């Protein structure tokens, strides 16, 4: 086995290992009550991270194989033999023009679709009629997308595979005939009633319309409504261009995004359609920052400033803040955001989360050394007004609590009576426990009732912090 084949085999094992990781994550979630309140990582975030790594590794492997083979003039066919390292079955189905088999094979391996997607365009090119191959694959599996099964996991996988096939077809710019368009039109008319308010259905439908150039069969208003429905997907802007929406329609869409609070989606459409002159992206980004700040305050207030709610509000604001920072860096508009100090705001919010976590550990019941009066007086602080940073939305930094020593020093102890008053220790006056020096003996005198102590100031010592004595009720 060559080095490339060994690496490819390891990449293929990523999906299997992810399933084991998901099982461990589910087991961890079963004990969520024992986890820190700041632990809010979801499986979708973990899956997205490893899928991105898998795709990146595969691309680098293909680049390495291609570059090494391009330097060898005597073996020009090495590229074709080495490139489909991971999924040679794709090419077999395409060479046989077996669209139904291709669709079923991809659905069965839908959990590895990101890896498959890297090789799919080149595999489809091996078919005599790529457009017919894709239609055969869709028609052969379309029964899975019926309304009765639309909520099943398999139906969701089917829609994702349809999108991958249609994206690959758009990428290779395959030849289309009238017969193929008629077949696609029939599928589109059957598909449309199932869309409703389901973005995944709208995404597949729009890819079908774009791939087979069916935009003229539907009203522009319908197309815009469906694009608005799929606006969270990164393919939305590409679909707009492929279907052929004019600039005015896209401008109406952008305004609709702004009116409904989807400011970052509007920013994406503005930049990718080169509409900076019609809108003001810097102002929109600053409005997004303001909205995220106000939303965090509102969430904290509605949740009575509980620790969980504060962490959730901080996480949402951090997410919005990082999204703005990403756009600012990608578009090289850092100079417009000098006053906002975005990176410093991120650091402050992260510090607040860490500080709350430390305070939670210190005040937890597992800490047996915390005195009673501190637990009683340790009330939840409210939001600090007038803080130095704009993004200080939750609790202000907490000062670490100072614990008194477990055993007071002899010079700081005076005997008190059961009512909390100092007992008389004048010469010749009896005290309940005999000589006052007995207080400092190695064996304490027996007490007939509880005795309470108040810390006193020794000679030459600064006055201690006032702590009211505890009186039994």
UniProtKB/Swiss-Prot annotation:
Keyword Transmembrane: no
Pfam families: Frigida
Domain of life: Eukaryota
GO BP of this protein: cell differentiation; flower development
Keyword Transcription: no
Positions of disulphide bridges: none
Compositional bias annotation for Polar residues: 361-373
Disordered, as annotated region: 356-384
Keywords linked to the UniProt accession: Coiled coil, Developmental protein, Differentiation, Flowering
Coiled coil: 3-35, 306-361
PANTHER family, sorted: FRIGIDA-LIKE PROTEIN 3-RELATED, INACTIVE FRIGIDA-LIKE PROTEIN 2
Extra information: In cv. Columbia and cv. Landsberg erecta, either FRL1 or FRL2, but not both, is functional and required for FRI-mediated up-regulation of FLC.
Family designation: Belongs to the Frigida family.
Function: Involved in flowering time regulation. Required for FRI-mediated up-regulation of FLC transcripts. Partially redundant with FRL1.
Name of this protein: FRIGIDA-like protein 2
Organism lineage: Eukaryota, Viridiplantae, Streptophyta, Embryophyta, Tracheophyta
């Amino acid at each position: 086995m060559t080095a490339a084949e060994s690496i490819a085999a390891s990449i293929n094992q990523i999906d299997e290992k992810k399933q084991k990781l998901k099982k461990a994550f589910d087991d961890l979630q079963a004990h969520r009550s024992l986890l820190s309140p700041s632990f809010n990582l979801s499986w979708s975030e973990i899956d997205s991270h490893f899928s991105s790594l898998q795709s990146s590794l595969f691309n680098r492997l293909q680049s390495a194989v291609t570059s090494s083979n391009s330097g060898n003039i005597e073996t020009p066919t090495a590229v074709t033999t080495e490139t489909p390292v991971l999924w040679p079955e794709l090419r077999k189905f395409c060479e046989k023009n077996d669209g139904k088999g291709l669709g079923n094979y991809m659905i069965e391996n839908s959990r590895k679709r990101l890896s498959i997607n890297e090789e799919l365009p080149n595999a489809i090119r091996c078919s005599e009629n790529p457009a017919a191959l894709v239609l055969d694959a869709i028609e052969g599996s379309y029964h899975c997308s019926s309304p009765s099964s639309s909520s099943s996991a398999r139906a969701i996988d089917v829609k994702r595979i349809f999108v991958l096939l249609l994206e690959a077809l758009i990428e290779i710019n395959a030849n289309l005939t009238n017969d193929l368009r008629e077949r696609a039109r029939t599928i589109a008319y059957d598909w449309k009633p199932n869309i409703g308010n389901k973005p995944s259905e709208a995404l597949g439908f729009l890819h079908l319309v774009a791939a087979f150039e069916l935009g003229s069969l539907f009203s522009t208003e319908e197309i815009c409504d469906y694009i608005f429905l799929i606006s969270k997907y990164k393919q939305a802007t590409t679909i707009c261009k492929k279907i052929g929406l004019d600039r005015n329609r896209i401008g109406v869409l952008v305004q609709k995004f702004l009116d409904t609070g989807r400011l970052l989606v509007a920013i994406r459409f503005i930049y990718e359609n080169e509409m900076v002159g019609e809108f003001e992206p810097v102002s929109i980004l600053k409005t997004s920052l303001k909205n995220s700040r106000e939303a965090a305050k509102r969430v904290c207030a509605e949740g009575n400033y509980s620790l969980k709610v504060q962490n959730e509000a901080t996480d949402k604001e951090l997410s919005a803040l990082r999204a703005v920072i990403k756009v600012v860096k990608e578009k090289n508009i850092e100079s417009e955001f000098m006053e906002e100090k975005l990176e410093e705001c991120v650091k402050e919010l992260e510090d607040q989360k860490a500080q709350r976590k430390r305070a939670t550990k210190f005040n937890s019941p597992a800490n047996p050394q915390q005195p009673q009066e501190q637990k009683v007086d340790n009330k939840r602080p409210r939001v600090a007004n007038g803080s130095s940073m704009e993004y200080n939305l939750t609790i202000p930094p907490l000062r670490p609590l100072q614990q008194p020593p477990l055993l007071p020093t002899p010079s700081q102890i005076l005997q008190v009576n059961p009512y909390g008053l100092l007992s008389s220790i004048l010469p010749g006056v009896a005290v309940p426990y005999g000589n006052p020096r007995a207080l400092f003996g190695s064996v304490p005198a027996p007490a007939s009732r509880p005795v309470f102590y108040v810390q006193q100031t020794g000679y030459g010592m600064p006055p201690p912090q006032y702590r009211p004595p505890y009186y039994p009720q």
